[in-house]
């Protein structure tokens, strides 16, 4: 989101400060939040949070946090020290619960079944865009969340050399290489 979204985590609790329009994404996480709308902006929400919480130190992912969020945290005195905790966050992401592993396994199965179900459509004359669209349809039919992790990359011939290619109206040709990079999500 272009609007500030910050999750503050302490040993026994967590709190989001986020735009009201993002609050449905929290879903069943059972995490408290303070929200704001575009009319008022984030300032009052961060001010409200600062009245209830103070940190002696705050770890952030230095490559991901924007100046906007850092300024809101600093200007409201939420933390006296901000440190780079990128390595800690990376380590935390490596640890998955059984439920998370099951969701990831299901997402892989959805992705594999979706591609296999349309491989017969990968033939000369079909465009990269057409194949990508069919793949998205199959991902959704097979149970992927509507928020795909990324738009499928379908790149044929010379386009296959571009790792971040967006599907075009280029038609597949007989015998040429086709790269497909795709994924599914299941329950987040």
Model-inferred region functions:
Residues 1-114:
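A composition/biophysics-driven feature that prefers long, compositionally simple stretches
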Residues 49, 76, 110-121, 134, ...:
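Generic non-transmembrane alpha-helical segments
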Residues 5-6, 32-38, 54-56, 122, ...:
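Generic detector of intrinsically disordered, low-complexity, polar/charged segments
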Residues 1, 86-89, 95, 126-188:
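Short catalytic-site patches enriched in acidic/histidine residues
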Residues 61-62, 119-127:
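Conserved short loop/turn motifs at secondary-structure junctions
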